[in-house]
Amino acid sequence: MVHFTAEEKATVASLWGKVNVEEAGGEVLGRLLVVYPWTQRFFDNFGNLSSSSAIMGNPKVKAHGKKVLTSFGDAVKHMDDLKGTFAHLSELHCDKLHVDPENFRLLGNVMVVVLASHFGKEFTPEVQAAWQKLVGGVANALAHKYH
């Protein structure tokens, strides 16, 4: 279990309140699919994923990215119970989708890159540390069903 200080919780929540979930979600998932192309196999029903511009402009990628980032909103609200918050998604991704749990870590790291690019100087090392801790906790929670 990951323990967050009150300061870390406030830092994460403060930045999260400024995130455009729709815009950032599409960018996070799109970048994951471009940078780690083997992840595309989980999205074969998304249509054209043949190039980075096709991926980044794909409406299904954008829609699912929004859904993924909305789940991160649940993490922000329930930082003290990530395992419980993501139990259903862990089961889905393990039992039905057979997603390699390492992909959750990759997604989290891409999310941190996107947040840094969106928030620039506001994304200080302290903010990054809090977010890295959160995305690591979410990745562990999503991988829980695998253990």
Curated annotation (Swiss-Prot):
GO terms for cellular component: blood microparticle; haptoglobin-hemoglobin complex; hemoglobin complex. It comes from the Eukaryota. The keyword Heme applies. Heme b binds at residues 64, 93. GO terms for molecular function: haptoglobin binding; heme binding; hemoglobin alpha binding; metal ion binding; organic acid binding; oxygen binding; oxygen carrier activity; peroxidase activity. Red blood cells. Residues 3-147 form the Globin domain. One of its GO terms (biological process) is hydrogen peroxide catabolic process. The modification Phosphoserine is found at residues 14, 51. Heterotetramer of two alpha chains and two epsilon chains in early embryonic hemoglobin Gower-2; two zeta chains and two epsilon chains in early embryonic hemoglobin Gower-1. Belongs to the globin family. This is Hemoglobin subunit epsilon. It comes from Bradypus tridactylus (Pale-throated three-toed sloth).
